[in-house]
Amino acid sequence: MDNIRIHSDFEGGNVKVLRVEDDTVFLQNELRDTLTDWFFWSFCVEGAQGRTLTFTFDKKWVGYFGAAVSRDYENWRWSETRISPYSFTYSFSYDESKVYFAHDMVYSIKNFNTLLSETGIKPDVLCLSRQGREVPLIRIGDGERKIFLTSRHHACESTGTYVLEGFIREYLVSQIENTELIIVPMVDYDGVICGDQGKNRAPYDHNRDYTDSPIYPETSAIISLAKKENVVFAIDFHSPYHLKGINDKVFVVRKYDSKRALFDRFGALLERYCADSDGMRYFLCDDMMPNTGWNADETPTSCSFFSSLSSCHLAFSLETAYFGTEDNKVSTRRLINEGRAVCRALSEYFKSL
């Protein structure tokens, strides 16, 4: 193993190598300032051509289909070599001098730049992050009705950003009448670049920062901007917990039972368009209802903030599984197609407004 390098020295990297025994690498993910146990990891292996290695974590952080694998940290596939919830194996071909592995199919800055290049979108700046980076803001369209879209309130939640990309691509070819998209694709921008968990940061994360005195520049800027706009609809794209149960599904998190009829109407449209899209499947019956499970938490969130705006017809988070199931399996293509279906469903929904 002397000539093999295993590291996280790249944008989005997150791993600690504990030890190496023969062809087995023992690993641990880094929580950093996350206060609770969380699962994201991402690392690179260089110089392992022709070798077969086993990677073993200290906790059960390997998904159903093994690791997400990429040669360029942009195009991903599943390794399909899971040994157990702790470990997976990988056989490096002789032309694989550098391979990236991750908990899930990461949506990186490279993916975002490819989207900008292919669509010609020119982003604005929402604000400067705590670390001095320009946080991207996208505006598309010129209609009076504003649709506010966000993702990566929690830095590690990549599936939601793929879904958001699909929404953007669909909107560009079939815009919703009299609307404008206002998009913050990576709210925790520093966290995305640094490879942080982002969830449950100390003292609290970006999605718990919708208070009268926000501590993060991004949430403060979103609040200020949204209050100036005629926001009629808001979607916050997320990924749920690691796996099992509802975490293997696509679901809407409903905050208010008073809007049940509106959620049902949109959900029925989304279920139909997802079924026709060759994307991740969504079923209305899987929605997380108000005051159930972790949705009983009354801490202010992006959705509670947008719901408080007098102009806002409906606001919710859309959660998309990291892995899915064998019959509803995550891939970058299916995530993007899910996003296209969300846009089509919303276009149909707006016809009744």
Q: What does each of the following model-derived ranges do?
A:
Residues 325-353:
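His/Asp/Glu-rich mid-to-C-terminal helical/loop segments that flank catalytic regions of hydrolases
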